[in-house]
Amino acid sequence: MTNQIEKELIEKVAKLSNLKLKEEEIELFSNQFKDILSFIDKLNEVDVKDTLPFYELQIEEKSEREDIPTGSITNEEAIKNAPQAKGGFFVVPRVVGEE
């Protein structure tokens, strides 16, 4: 990837994440992104053709608990500490459809 594409990708991800990044941060994340891709390339070079896949790494027995219904909090209790609420619902900033 070229440096320009990496910067554009970082800027796009920041916008989608609703983050405002400084130019130094974009450069830092771009370099980190480059390092991550380099590491992935190294992993792709590893010969694993004779290695069996791991399906489950946890060997110990799994214990399941009985599913017992319990009480829950009321709607009023749930929203009492919310920064904003309207009509019994949480009010949050819009994050979808802003492009």
UniProtKB/Swiss-Prot annotation:
Q: Which InterPro entries match?
A: Asp/Glu-ADT_sf_sub_c, GatC
Catalytic reaction annotation: L-glutamyl-tRNA(Gln) + L-glutamine + ATP + H2O = L-glutaminyl-tRNA(Gln) + L-glutamate + ADP + phosphate + H(+); L-aspartyl-tRNA(Asn) + L-glutamine + ATP + H2O = L-asparaginyl-tRNA(Asn) + L-glutamate + ADP + phosphate + 2 H(+)
Does the UniProt entry include the keyword Hydrolase? no
Q: What SUPFAM superfamilies does the record point to?
A: Glu-tRNAGln amidotransferase C subunit (SSF141000)
According to its UniProt record, what is one Pfam family this protein matches?
GatC
UniProt keywords (A-Z) are: ATP-binding, Ligase, Nucleotide-binding, Protein biosynthesis
What is one GO biological process annotated to this record? regulation of translational fidelity
Instruction: Give its E.C. classification number.
Output: 6.3.5.-
Q: What class of enzyme is it?
A: ligase
Q: What terms describe the molecular function in GO for this protein?
A: asparaginyl-tRNA synthase (glutamine-hydrolyzing) activity; ATP binding; glutaminyl-tRNA synthase (glutamine-hydrolyzing) activity
Superkingdom in the source lineage: Bacteria
> Which family is annotated?
Belongs to the GatC family.
Function of the molecule: Allows the formation of correctly charged Asn-tRNA(Asn) or Gln-tRNA(Gln) through the transamidation of misacylated Asp-tRNA(Asn) or Glu-tRNA(Gln) in organisms which lack either or both of asparaginyl-tRNA or glutaminyl-tRNA synthetases. The reaction takes place in the presence of glutamine and ATP through an activated phospho-Asp-tRNA(Asn) or phospho-Glu-tRNA(Gln).
Which PANTHER family does the entry link to?
GLUTAMYL-TRNA(GLN) AMIDOTRANSFERASE SUBUNIT C, MITOCHONDRIAL
Q: How does it assemble?
A: Heterotrimer of A, B and C subunits.
What name is this protein filed under?
Aspartyl/glutamyl-tRNA(Asn/Gln) amidotransferase subunit C
Q: Which organism is it from?
A: Sulfurihydrogenibium sp. (strain YO3AOP1)
Q: Which gene encodes it?
A: gatC
